[in-house]
Swiss-Prot record:
This is Major vault protein alpha. It comes from Dictyostelium discoideum (Social amoeba). Its main location: cytoplasm. CDD domains: MVP_shoulder. It is found in: Cytoplasm; Nucleus. Keywords: Acetylation, Cytoplasm, Nucleus, Repeat, Ribonucleoprotein. The modification N-acetylalanine is found at residue 2. Residues 646-663 have a biased composition (Basic and acidic residues). One of its GO terms (biological process) is response to bacterium. Disulfide bonds: none annotated. Residues 643-663 are annotated as: Disordered.
Length: 843
């Protein structure tokens, strides 16, 4: 085994490491050879393949050997190969080589990196070195631009791969300098400086350049401009103008069709064109003056037709465009001067108000404010408005004419008390009256027929009364007198709110509790007819009817007081017998002659009570009410029983009289019947005599007449039967003839249609068959025909069928119709035989 292990066969392109134990030096043996190991030698590694580097590949060797200028290995004093410990070496494509003791391959054999066009490698120097007379210091960075193959170095590290940026039309590339450098145009740039590259195409940024963004151009049109602002002082290359920091300006389509903002230009926004028609105007605030600077606090009026861009700092007053005021004959404008100015030789002080009347067109100057547009207010004879003079404060009502407010006038709103509004809303039957009421319109009220309305003027401190039917129109300082009347039964105050006072005649109902002298408490329901006696021609009488605010409550109280006093003086039985007399005397009183007066007058407001109606009288105490009810029921029962007895006696009397008349009539009828029976017997005797003598003659005569009538009837019947048979035969013949003609024409048309159909189908089938034959071919048909018969024969033989029928799926056999046809033919034959038998019987 020792001898076998001491002989090592090294293949071509393989190597081994052998250690000499005497010198402790390791050497390399390269094949092809057969190496015999000595006793003092030891195989350290191998055999291993040599390192092979293909074309366009490389590898990295750690701790490489040292070679002299001639490329020979450098040995130390012990005969051992010197190594550069801690160093690395990149080896490119060459002959296969072995690794010397101490050398190691880092990684794998790697292909060289190819840098494509429009790309570059950013390289960094790891240590100082000189290449192609260019000295690089550790930390330096530079670009290796393609297209090329990069040969790596130990001293250089690839940081990243950089791609070129494509700059399209209407685009620019914004760059920033990472440190002081020169760009590709040779312009010196400071650290942090930004600039634009506007040339179209691919741009590969330098090693000290950073791509910030791609800036797209703004397309400018006739209707769109660009608002720019300078972030710092710079030279505007487009207009060759020095721009200061914070300056703002517009770029319009006349300057350039497209604009790419510079690095020191900030796009504030896009400004759209402002267009004015010939019927429009606008006011520009802070306009740009002739010197190009904004005139702060100034205004400029611009009229159409006009199109313009608002410059930076300019704005429209109210942010809108105004239409020119077009005034008709019935319209006007109320104007107010914002400041003192003169126009057309007329001076206006600040705060002046004046009117412009139509018809005209008007564009207000910047010194004038349009307060409002006024229209002439059309008023009927029954309509009006409240107008206040803002200088004097005087309010007046304008009625019955179209009115245009003057410059120092305004509409005045008249506020009505809530009670008045509720009454007006209730009488107008409009639930939205309060919300929809125009307070500037003169308040009107239609006084109903036979009513009175009081209006009080608080300024003049006097009132007036209007009698209906009439229209009441309130002045600025006038108000309605609202009546608060009592209502319900018994009367309660403040139940009815009204403006109009009805003069009557009318009635009111009240419930009065009274007590008789024997302490019986009664509830009286009384109705009073009332009316006002007023002379409308006298103002004093008209004012007098409104002196009592609640005439209903006061009058009912007064009448109730009189009634209670009168009832208290009489007993319950007495009052129950003559309640109407007691109440009327207590209310109306007695005249000098002792008669009851016809009315009861209230002198304070001319109210007259003309009549009293007692609707009901009920005891208040329940026991009294029950006792009274029992007595009333007892009286009713007594009266009812007496009436029943009288009715029964009268009925018996009438019944006896009727029975006597019936007996008398019966006797009379029996006498008449006896007389009739006598006459009947006489007639029976006469008829018996006549019957015995003329019976034979009558029988003979009757027999002859009967035979004659029967003969005539038979003759007539025969004639009628003959005529009927003739008519029936003729009608049957004509009907049968018409039927046969119709059947023949129908069958003829059916046959013609069938012939046409069969002809068309035959043509279609022929053309179809011809087309199929032509498409399939003669030889193919022949093969199909032969194959089909043979196959069918074999198939049927295999099935064991003795009789069969073959048809295709397109022409199925209808066995049901076949059976029906057979049955139908049999039925026709039976019908024909029956018809023949019937005709034989007739013959």
């Amino acid at each position: 085994m020792a001898d076998l292990n001491s002989v090592i066969r090294i293949k071509p392109f393989h190597f081994i490491h052998v250690l000499d134990n005497n010198t402790n030096v390791t050497r390399v043996e390269v094949g092809p050879q057969t190496f015999t190991r000595q006793d003092h030698e030891k195989l350290v590694s191998g055999p291993e393949p040599m390192i092979m580097i293909p074309q366009r590949n490389y590898c990295t060797i750690s701790n490489p050997v040292v070679r002299n200028e001639n490329g020979s290995l450098v040995l130390d004093e012990y005969g051992q190969v010197k190594l550069r410990h801690g160093d690395e070496e990149i080896r490119f494509s060459q002959e296969p080589f072995p690794l010397y003791p101490g050398e190691k391959i880092s990684g794998k054999v790697t292909a060289l990196q190819v840098v494509a066009p429009l790309k570059a490698l950013r390289l960094r120097a790891l240590r100082d070195f000189t290449e192609a007379k260019v000295t690089h210091v550790a930390g330096d960075e530079w670009l290796f631009e393609g297209p090329a193959t990069y040969l790596p170095r130990i001293d250089v590290r690839i940081e990243e791969e950089i791609k070129a940026t494509i700059i399209g039309p209407n685009q620019a590339l914004k760059l920033r300098a990472n440190k002081a450098c020169s760009d590709r145009s040779g312009v010196a740039r400071k650290a942090g400086e930004e600039w634009l590259v506007r040339q179209h195409g691919a741009y590969l940024p330098g090693v000290d350049e950073k791509v910030v963004e791609i800036v797209n151009a703004y397309v400018l049109t006739d209707k769109k401009a660009l608002h720019l602002k300078a972030t710092k002082t710079f030279l505007d290359e487009t207009r060759k103008t020095q721009r200061k920091a914070g300056e703002e300006w517009l770029v319009v389509s006349t300057d350039a069709e497209t604009h790419i903002p510079d690095v020191y230009e900030q796009v504030v926004g896009e400004v759209h064109i402002t267009t004015l028609s010939n019927r429009q105007y606008c006011v520009v605030l802070d306009p740009i003056g002739a010197n190009g600077k904004p005139q702060l606090g100034h205004k400029q009026l611009r009229k159409g037709e006009l199109a313009f861009f608002l410059n930076p700092g300019e704005s429209l007053e109210g942010n809108k465009i105004h239409n020119i005021y077009v005034l008709t004959e019935q319209e006007a404008l109320l104007l107010r001067a914002k400041e003192t100015f003169s126009i057309d030789g007329e001076s206006h002080l600040a705060g002046d108000r004046w009117m412009i009347y139509g018809p005209c067109d008007y564009v207000p100057p910047v010194q004038v404010e349009v307060v409002e547009k006024r229209e002439s207010i059309p008023l009927d004879e029954n309509e009006g408005i409240y107008v206040r003079d803002i200088k004097t404060g005087k309010v007046a009502s304008i009625k019955g004419q179209s009115y245009m407010l003057k410059a120092n006038e305004e509409l005045w709103e008249k506020v009505l008390p809530r009670t008045v509004e509720e009454v007006l809303a209730k009488e107008s039957l409009n639930p939205e009256f309060t919300d929809n009421r125009d307070s500037t319109r003169v308040v009107t009220y239609r006084a109903p027929h036979n009513s009175a309305v009081q209006i009080y003027d608080y300024k003049e401190k006097k009132s007036r009364v209007v009698f209906g039917p009439d229209l009441v129109m309130l002045g600025p300082d006038e108000h309605f007198t609202v009546l608060s009347l009592s209502g319900d039964k018994p009367k309660r105050p403040h139940q009815i709110k009204a403006i109009a006072l009805f003069l009557g005649p009318d009635f009111m109902t009240d419930v009065v509790i009274v007590e008789t002298s024997d302490h019986a408490r009664l509830s009286l329901k009384l109705s009073y007819n009332w009316e006002f006696k007023v002379d409308r021609s006298k103002i004093e009488d008209a004012q007098k009817i409104f002196q009592v605010p609640d005439f209903v409550g006061d009058s009912c109280k007064a009448i109730a007081s009189r009634v209670r006093g009168a009832v208290a003086a009489v007993s319950f039985d007495d009052f129950h017998k003559r309640s109407a007399e007691v109440i009327r005397q207590s209310v109306f009183g007695l005249d000098e002659s002792g008669e009851v007066r016809k009315n009861f007058s209230f002198n304070s407001n001319n109210l007259v009570i003309t009549n009293i109606d007692i609707q009901s009288v009920e005891p208040v105490d329940q026991r009294t009410r029950d006792s009274l009810q029992k007595s009333v029921q007892l009286a009713i029962e007594i009266t009812t029983k007496s009436q029943e007895a009288a009715a029964r006696h009268e009925a018996e009397r009438l019944e006896q009289g009727a029975r006597g008349r019936l007996e008398r009539q019966k006797i009379h009828d029996e006498a008449q019947a006896e007389l009739a029976r006598k006459d009947l017997l006489q007639l029976q005797a006469q008829s018996a005599a006549v019957e015995s003598t003329g019976q034979a003659t009558a029988e003979a005569q009757a027999t002859a007449e009967a035979a004659n009538i029967a003969a005539e009837a038979n003759v007539k019947q025969a004639e009628l039967k003959a005529q009927a048979t003739k008519i029936r035969s003729e009608s049957e013949i004509s009907l049968l003839k018409a039927k046969r003609e119709n059947e023949l024409s129908y069958q003829k048309s059916i046959d013609e249609l069938e012939l046409t159909k069969q002809s068309d189908l035959a043509e279609i089938e022929a053309s179809k068959f011809k087309a199929i034959v032509e498409s399939i071919g003669r030889d193919t048909l022949k093969s199909i025909a032969c194959a089909g018969n043979e196959m069918q024969a074999k198939l049927l033989q295999g099935l064991g069928l003795k009789s069969f029928m073959i048809t295709d799926g397109k022409s199925p056999l209808n066995l049901f119709d076949t059976a029906n046809g057979i049955i139908g033919n049999n039925n026709q034959m039976v019908n024909m035989s029956n018809a023949a038998k019937q005709s034989g019987r007739r013959n």
